[in-house]
Amino acid sequence: MFYDCSQLIYLDAINFDSSQVTDMSGMFDQCSNLKSVNLNNFNTSLVTNMNSMFADCGELESLDLSSFNTNKVLNMDSMFYGCSALISLNLNNFDTSLVEDMTYMFKDCNNLVSLDISNFNTNNVKSMIAMFESCNSLAILNLKNFDTTQVNEMNGIFSGCSSLKVLNIESFAYNQPDINTEKMFDNCNQSMIYCINKDNSPEDVINQLSDFPNLYCSETCFQNIDNKIIPCRNSCIDSWENDNT
């Protein structure tokens, strides 16, 4: 609808009737100068495809999608790919229970420091290829609620997350027989604290993480102290404090 509207800077869609729309793929793709968009009244209740919806909106700094109804969406591939100026992203009410594809979903969101996707239901997701690749400002990523039992492609999922200090993937399962886990942690922060379940992780994943000097922690809970999420176990807390003094 607005694909490649490179001159579009502001958009207030308060009066748009989107109640019958089923496909929003590429809707704002390559709106390279879009700085502000109001989608609070968007009706997305019938939408099944949000592929590349905001891809390459390189000037967009804030996006509140908490009003979106996504309970029918199957495809979120590249949804925020290339939103390089994005600082604030509100996905609090996203229902991802039917989503099958999250490939490149947050790739190249270079200025995103924090991302709360604790509400995501990923039990039907099959692809997470490069999902967070080159999110090089992201400091903490808590994915302890992620269900990856159906995922068969994780290659490059955290590649280029060069500022990542804490990563919790202890719930990750690698059940699919031909699952691709190549280069999951390429160019990640070498002082990163990672939390995994070693008993449920393939040798390839463990070998990749052996390059990181910090102790891993399994069965880890996270707590919020002074608006910072830190691991509860003593070994991880010591590593975290040593890394932040």
Placement of each model-derived feature along the sequence:
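Negatively charged
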Residues: 1-244
